[in-house]
Amino acid sequence: CFDDAVALYDFDMELRFLMFKVIQRIEIALRSDIIHEFSVCHGPFWFLDDTLVDDVQKFKENRNAIERELQRSREDFIREHRLHYDEPAFPPAWKTLEIVSLGTLSKLYYNFKDKKAKKRIARRFNLPQHEVLESWMRSLTVLRNCCAHHSRLWNRRLANSPQMKATLRGAWVDIAGLDNNKVYAIFCCVAYWL
């Protein structure tokens, strides 16, 4: 009936709002850990070094995306940087990557060659391997975009499903019978991150 449809719509809207709020906290933690770890290991311009990546074509695509996001940025700290520095063309990672999307950040992490640094980041989130964090970041990006663009969450199937380990160090769900293509799977990942 119509009232049920309205109630489901309202529930979904509230769910999106709550998830978006939580995702912001996770995104900030991911962003700061990635920027810090890779900058300490490889310098402030690691994201511009194609010798540090697995796939040079993806590196070029990521660099172009970063450049577009920098050009669109209206952030004071980016404008201030441009006023004072002509070279290099990009500000250091802690400025540049502050304005990139979660999707771009996820792609940078995925393509980065230094598996030891990636594993250290994954371990900070209590995850055993960087591949698990990569899959969770891709799924989180899809969830974040659904929330930001007011797409339905209830009963959604994910294009990028997260890797679901049977056991993790922290409090984790029993994944027996869990369909990791459904949005509930990434909800479980979000709960674990918190």
Language model segments and positions:
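Long, contiguous internal "core" modules enriched in hydrophobic/ aromatic residues
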Residues: 1-194
